[in-house]
Amino acid sequence: MKASILLMISFFLLLSCSKNEPDESNQDAASIDDDLAGPISRPKAGYGSDGNYQVAKISFPSPLYSGKNVEIFYPKGTISPKPVIFYSHPYGGELSEYNIGLYEFIAKKGYVVVFAPYPTTGVTVEERYDTLWQSFKKAVRDYPGIIDTKKVGFMGHSFGAGACFALAHRGFIDEGWGENGRFIFAMAQWYSYEITQAELQSFPENTKLITQVYNDDITNDHRLAIDIFKNINIPDTEKDFILIKKSVLPTFTYTAEHNLPNTQSSYDAYDYYGIYRLLDAMIDYSFNGNTAAKNVALGNGSKEQVTMPSYNGQALSPLEVTDNPSALYPQSKYSFQCSGLNNPRIANCN
């Protein structure tokens, strides 16, 4: 099994670092000269707009990954602990620069994010999970003046999204984190290890969930995300399954491939409107109880949730939201299929 996982990882590395070109804005947008690819700029106000905090960073040696540092991004000038998001990266995304826009967005909004690298090769899946977990635990233990464990989110992409559920269960159940707010935000999910069906059915009642899949992803079978979404005990009112599709403008294409979001290959309006905007609202709803935020993050297909921006009168593809997802494509489309022998939940493939 170890050899086959190493082959998978090699394939992941080829796919983790590419993304095409995109475009958007919640109103009809004119071309603005900023650092985003494509003609559509960031939201200027509301959810998804940049916060006012400057970003500070602390690094400390990884407890299990020799020579690597765990990084904590937080609002500069913090004088009291802030709510925290523990981020689990995809295969090959060991450097925070790969998705630095996301981490800085979180810190600018006044929250903390912990980025923990794990080895891409030479270790087992379980060892990667342990590296993530021990890194998160050390951050909490060593920086109580920055991290407030009463309000906690777990977020991840691909391998990291699959890991989110086991890690969140440890944090929420074993450690009691998140008593005043809990959520999970899973993107382009890979296989989920180290979590049983009974554990999936035992998440605390204040846990929220956004699961995102990307229509042109040919890496991870959407059935992996569908399985966990349907089997977790979070009620439909507190979770949404979201599909993002590409948008083609005359001069730019906003893609919805496996590597959405990332800051390296194409940092664009899809990062902001498709991911940051929903995350921003999810944080506000989960941590502050703002019901208006719920309509954006978990709106069950509300206009406020699904509407993407326009450019020169052409609207970008709206988000597609459901509580009862089904697979749109055959497993043969994907490199990592639900029926793959390395899937510990293979019995749940439909």
Regions found by a protein language model. Give the residues of each.
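Short amphipathic alpha-helix adjacent to the substrate-entry channel of hydrolases
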Residues: 96-115
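Catalytic nucleophile-loop/oxyanion-hole region of alpha/beta-hydrolase
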Residues: 95, 116-136, 143, 200
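N-terminal cap/lid segment of alpha/beta-hydrolase-fold proteins
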Residues: 30-80
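C-terminal catalytic-base region of ester-bond hydrolases, centering on the histidine
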Residues: 222-350
